[in-house]
Amino acid sequence: MRTRIPASLLVISLVAVTASVGCGGAEAHDAKDPTSSKSSGGGDGKGVKQGDKAPTFTLDSMNGAGKMTIAPGKVTIVDFWATWCEPCKKSFPKLQELYVKYKASGLEIVAVSVDDEKNGITDFAKTHGAKFPVGWDDGKKIADKWKPENMPSSYIIGKDGLVKHVHRGYHDGEEAEVEKELKALL
């Protein structure tokens, strides 16, 4: 005799696992077509890793911060995110707290949206309290270089331009670990 597991329990379990790990890579979602195979290069294990030289880029800020880039001689968090990503809604306020706390010590945050369209990006940033620079990776050219595997994916870049830490996805309480890493670098 087999025991049947209620469908609602399976759905709840799937939602919990997805929320705790993070959204799939940028290729896992297309704003108009969730089954799209558009790729940002994530998921192949060949993305930017700890110890790598951070790929350079310049991006226009959508919230009035001018040009966004990895500032030489500063500790920078490069955060890949999307408006459709549930864990990103939790991580943005935590990034803002870190930004306020450590900006005077030299912390920069560069938030790179991998959304297919720019509609909603600025509203998302406002709704979730982001005062740090937020930009749109039109055509996913930056994501193609970095190859984030999950949303959000955060890369902590040291003053020397090397990737010191990589965080894929977001889980509650992760900001304590990130803060410890930042303190050691600032």
Give residue ranges: language-model regions:
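Conserved redox-active cysteine motifs that mediate thiol-disulfide chemistry
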Residues: 80-97
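Conserved hydrophobic/aromatic "anchor" residues
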Residues: 57, 80-84, 124, 132, ...
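A short beta-strand-turn-helix
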Residues: 48-51, 56-76
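Thiol-based oxidoreductase modules, predominantly thioredoxin-like and allied folds used
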Residues: 106-118, 130-139
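Thiol/disulfide oxidoreductase modules built on the thioredoxin-like
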Residues: 74, 123-131, 137-185
